[in-house]
Amino acid sequence: TGPHDVAFNSAGEMVAVIGLGANPLSRTASVELENLGQLISATTSGAWSNWVDIAQYEADENPAGGPLDSNPFSVAAVDDGYIVSDAGMNALLHVSASGTISVVATFPTRTAEFPPGSGSMVPMDPVPTGVKVGPDGAYYVGELTGFPFPAGGANVWRIVPGQPPELYASGFTNVIDVAFDEDGNLYVLEIATNSLLSGDPTGALIRVTSSGRHQV
C-alpha cells in the first residue's frame, strides 16, 4: 500500500499516511512491512522517513477494543499537529508536533441487515475514512462502513475534542472522503454509491447544503 492521504502544515512541511489494513503485529513477517501503518514526513527534496508509528499505537492501546487492526487512512493539519483517521482502529487520533499520539474519538459499532430483506442483523464496523477540519473548527469524518456495506448506511460525524462524536449527516454509501467549499457546503465522496457488494463500480460526489443534498 502507498500513501492514502497527505497534508501540509503552516510551514509547508508535508506528512502522509501509509495504510496497513491488518493486525499491526503482522508487520514482523518482513522488513518491508515495517513501513506500513505509518505517518511519514517528507522534505521538499523528496526525501521521506517514518515519523509516527500509528499501527503500533493500535497494538499498544487498542482504543476502540476488539481485534487488533490498523489502517491509517486520512490526515489533516491542525494548529498543534495533525488529525489522523484509522479505518481499522475505528478511531480518530491527534498527533502532536512532537509526535505524541492521543485519542480524539472512537466510533461505535452498529448492526446492519444481511442478507438484505432477511431481517437478520450482523455487526458492522464504522470504518472511519476521510477527515477534514470544518469551517466551525470541528473535525468531520466520513465512514466507509464495514461488511455488509449497506447502501445508505454510512454517516458523516462531527467531532469536537472532549465530546462524543455527533451525527452530522447520514444516508450515504461507502464514503472515502469529505471536504468543504468556501461557502461551507459539505462534499461527500462515495466509492460505490450502490454498495461495494453490488458489483457496480459507480461512485458519486454529493454536495450537502442547508436545503438538502445534490449529486454533483
Residue ranges and their predicted role:
Residues 1, 48-56, 102-109, 113-114, ...:
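Beta-propeller fold detector
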Residues 13-15, 38, 80-83, 89-90, ...:
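Generic structural signal for coil-to-beta-strand starts
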Residues 16-37, 140-153, 188-203:
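Short, conserved, GDST-rich strand-edge loop motifs in beta-rich repeat architectures
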Residues 35-40, 91-94, 103, 154-157, ...:
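A short loop-to-beta-strand structural motif that recurs across blades of beta-propeller domains
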Residues 194, 202-216:
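C-terminal closing repeat unit and adjoining cap/tail of repeat-based domains
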